[in-house]
Amino acid sequence: EKNLNDDAARFCNDYLITRKLTRETIKKFRLGYSSNKDSSLFDFLKSKNYVEDDLLRSNIVKLDKNKKIRDFFYKRLIFPIFNSYGKVVGFGGRSLDGSNPKYINSPESNIFQKRNILYNLNLAKNFARKKNNLLICEGYMDVISLNQKGITSVVAPLGTSLTEEQLNLSWKYCSKPTIMFDGDVAG
């Protein structure tokens, strides 16, 4: 989140402006930016005495092909992914420079299994249950944009398809969720 205030994040902020996101929305969804340096998070955590092996196991850093530790996400808009209890369990990252893949998620782990998580369920679940209404849209930016327009009972799968587990999860909060995916190719 702090990196969004850096000069290096100007490109990211320009993207958020083109998407017409307000500062309040950016804060609400705790959006961030991963630095242009491929090891800035690793270097910061090492300075705080975190152990390399623990950081590697956490999947927020990885070994590159030259066996150098680097941040898993860098030069990306960052979307924290929360479980239904509001705890961060992973991250999504969107490239802003045209590189592929456009979106990446944290690697699967014991606490992050994307097939079992709906983005924004932590914020949408109470309204969904109260109104028996849940909209499942395609991605992070769809959720955030709709939420900013006042549609708060909205979630998204963490990938190009809705899993059976995610559909079952939605039924815990709404008897008939509405699925509204884009008409274009996923991504």
Which stretches of residues belong to each language-model region?
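Phosphate/diphosphate-binding loops
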Residues: 182-186
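Non-catalytic accessory segments of DNA primases and related replication-initiation nucleases
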Residues: 1-53, 106
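Phosphate-handling DNA/RNA-contact segment within nucleic-acid enzymes
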Residues: 35-177
